[in-house]
Amino acid sequence: MRFFLCSIFMMISPIWPLGENPLPGDPYVIVNKRTNELAVILDNKVEGVYSVATGKTDDLTPEGEFSVTVKAENPYYRKKNIEGGSPDNPLGARWIGFDAKGTDGRIYGIHGTNREESVGKFVSNGCIRMHNDEVVHLFQTIPVGTRVLITDDNRSFEEIAIEHKALIKKQDIPIE
């Protein structure tokens, strides 16, 4: 009977990944609101650090660990009915949406901009803005499911990544 109940439960329950998340080597994104920088962790190293814009006030850009749920090229701006690719579109060249505050990845995201001069400043309504060429690179680098950590921290990206198991310290790497 126990076997039967366990079998039924396994068939109707979602399949969860086994082990730690992220796995060593998986892409991982860290946004530091204190410095307005974004780091990409890839293959156990910081692959790149980019200047970004975050919320006008500290509470607008949510903090926590989220997952990329949607990606779009030349995203449509629904709020003002602006087609993707338009020079008037504030979302720029790419949209990388994540599930902050229980949303579906269409409210909060990392995106390009039509105001390149705003990058590096505290000016957004909660999203993370990047230069268009840099968000295109990020878009190509990270898949849906990538973890995104948004924090306000005075530590280095390496220290933050080690704490969140996105980087393994050299002495912790097993020798085969």
Swiss-Prot record:
Active site (record annotation): H111 (proton donor/acceptor), C127 (nucleophile)
Signal peptide: 1-25
EC number in record: 2.-.-.-
Keyword terms, alphabetized: Cell shape, Cell wall biogenesis/degradation, Glycosyltransferase, Hydrolase, Peptidoglycan synthesis, Signal, Transferase
InterPro entries: LD-transpeptidase, LD_TPept_cat_dom, Transpep_catalytic_dom
Pathway: Cell wall biogenesis; peptidoglycan biosynthesis
Top class in the EC scheme: transferase
Hydrolase found in the keyword field: yes
GO molecular function terms attached to this record: glycosyltransferase activity; peptidoglycan L,D-transpeptidase activity
Domain of life per record: Bacteria
A GO BP entry: cell wall organization
Domain L,D-TPase catalytic, chain residue ranges per copy: 27-151
Family: Belongs to the YkuD family.
Protein name according to UniProt: Putative L,D-transpeptidase YqjB
Gene source species: Bacillus subtilis (strain 168)
